[in-house]
Amino acid sequence: MAHTLYIVATPIGNIEDITFRAVRILKEVSLVLAEDTRHSRILFDAYNIATPMEAYHDFNKEKVTPKYVEFLKNEGDIALISDAGTPGVADPAFNLVRECVRQSIDVRAIPGPCAMITALISSGMPTDHFTFQYFSPKKSAQRIHLLEKLKHE
């Protein structure tokens, strides 16, 4: 029987902004995948998390995704974390999650901080409808074109 991939939200600025459940999951899984293990080590040290950690990022995701799918099938549970906030929002988590869903491996989200929602609710703008755009284009003309397109959504 396959194990579970946990998508665990991590703090986005204040190290205390993590749930009890997230800390428990990070301690209980067999392996944690992190965008930047050096950055995540700070969180691990603060909460005495001793779980083995490996890198999962944009530069290795294609190569290592099959390895972690096999790990989930045969060895144990994995927690996937990003540098800050909720994995899967404009980061490499999507690749592993998609492959797990394709192969009927259990995927569970452990909610917590999300920069997008934090910014929205503190903006004073209506929250019943919004559009998310990751990074805007660098060139001014492309940015203006994108904003013109989005203003009617």
What feature does the model see in each segment?
Residues 1-59:
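Glycine-rich, flexible N-terminal cofactor/catalytic loop recognition
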Residues 2-3, 118-153:
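Beta-strand/loop-alpha-helix module characteristic of Rossmann-like adenine-cofactor folds
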Residues 18-19, 64-65, 93, 142-143:
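Amphipathic coiled-coil/heptad-repeat helices and related helical stalk/stem segments
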Residues 22-28, 67, 71, 96-103, ...:
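Catalytic-core regions built around general acid/base machinery
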Residues 45-50, 72, 93-94:
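Glycine-rich loop at the start of a catalytic domain that most often binds anionic cofactors/ligands
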Residues 55-63, 135-140:
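Conserved helicase motor
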Residues 58-73, 92:
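Short phosphate-binding loop-to-helix
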Residues 73-133:
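Short glycine-cluster motifs
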